[in-house]
Regions:
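Flexible beta-alpha connector loops of hexameric P-loop NTPases
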Residues: 16-22, 55-68, 102-113
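Conserved protein kinase catalytic core
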Residues: 25, 54-55, 98, 161
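Acidic, glycine-rich A-domain
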Residues: 28, 64-67, 122
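Cytosolic-facing regulatory segments adjacent to core modules
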Residues: 1-41, 166
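Phosphate-binding/switch region of NTP-binding enzymes
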Residues: 72-171
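Helical hairpin unit composed of two closely spaced alpha helices linked by a short loop
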Residues: 43-79
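Active-site-proximal loop/turn and secondary-structure-junction residues that shape catalytic pockets
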Residues: 23, 51, 93-95
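Short coil/turn segments at beta-strand junctions that form active-site/ligand-binding loops
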Residues: 40-43, 85
Length: 171
């Protein structure tokens, strides 16, 4: 019981959860994130998932879907830079990407393949605007590997210190 209390306190001191009972636009979310940053100095923001954000009606009239996402992601980049925090944006794959499976004869034959950058809802804007792109993939229907997460590094902006993308077949 003491360990549980200690763990809860640790989590509360290191993480804040923004109420998920409200649907935010990216503008409202950044306003909330700024208010929290002013009160509590955090270093990272996770948006999970991006497609849970409502479209800002003012911007939606000006841009098509791709341009809208590009604009929002640019705003997130600026916020990240101005507030000196890392922002992680979780995305889901498009339906067609979920239908792509490993070929016959492959060790994962018939299992859904990991996403590529362009496979997320909103497409290439996410890969274009992000410094780094990581795909966390699980084969939940695999008889033995259902509990493992395969981490595919799809993009690394800064490679001078040794960072690099992982080979597609070797996450």
């Amino acid at each position: 019981e003491e360990l549980i209390t200690k763990s809860i306190n640790w989590a509360d001191n290191h993480f804040k959860v923004i109420d998920a009972d409200k649907i935010y636009t990216y503008v409202e979310l950044l306003k909330e994130a700024k208010a929290i940053k002013d009160a509590w100095d955090y270093q990272g923001l996770l948006i999970d998932p991006y497609n849970s954000l409502a479209r800002d009606s003012r911007l939606a009239k000006q841009y098509n879907g791709y341009e809208y996402n590009y604009y929002c992601l640019t705003e997130l980049r600026l916020f990240s830079s101005q507030e000196k925090i890392a922002i992680w944006v979780n995305c889901h794959g498009v339906t067609d990407a979920m239908r792509k499976v490993y070929a016959s004869g492959h060790e994962y034959e018939g299992m859904v393949r990991p996403l590529k950058m362009s496979d997320v809802e909103g497409g290439g804007a996410f890969g274009n605007r992000a410094d780094d792109v990581v795909c966390i993939h699980r084969m939940t229907s695999h008889p033995n590997e259902w509990m493992f997460s395969h981490i595919n590094v799809l993009k690394i902006k800064e490679t001078e210190t040794g960072g690099r993308c992982s080979p597609y077949e070797q996450p």
